[in-house]
Amino acid sequence: DGTGYDIDTANFPDMAGFVNWAHENGVMLLFNDHTHKTDKQALDPEELKYHTENLTNLLKLGVDGWWYDRNWGYTLHSPYADSITFTTFGEVLYNDILASYTSVKRLFLLCNADWVRHGHVESAPSVIGRRYGIQWTGDITSEAMQLRREVVNMVEKTTAGASPYMSSDLGGFKRAKEQSEAMFTRWIQYGALSPVFRIHSTMELGGAKYDKLPYTYSAETQTVLKTYMNLRYNLLP
């Protein structure tokens, strides 16, 4: 059902070998975490043991980080819901599990900013949440209006929220109409000047095929995309 920590051996018969191959080719791997359903609280000893053991087993394979994809909010409950949201509580737990695994490698955590849900601001930024990893603004659409919101979200979060490593699902994630090359170009231009440049991998949105691979677009569009991608890396210190 797409949850849990078991490896799909039909598609990955040798996960350790796959991880090694990726690293040999300069690719870092971030696993997306969707765990089972439960009504237990986040500090329940059995739940802590379950997540710690399973996350650690995958880290031993060489995984470079975790995408904490809101799932703890749907499966566990914060014991301090009035002051610490489920999103932030999950960030704390996942971060501690990563940190306890190794002190010589900087593993990283991608997590949802708890003040915004699916690109829409819901509350003031969390004081606690700003401490943890790379954050993103949730499952957003690909339309121009959402791109406009993301520019505002990025400025507000990186300044008022004091969380410098913010990111968006570049190109959008859901409910898209047929996507134009011009619209995808605008997303890349925005992303190139954002703290984190991350194109979302969804290839079909709202029943319409939507290719996110830059090299599949026209030669003219590729030239523009390459220009902005190169600009980003030229600006990096």
Question: Residue spans of the language-model regions?
Answer:
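Catalytic-domain carbohydrate-binding cleft regions of carbohydrate-active enzymes
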Residues: 1-237
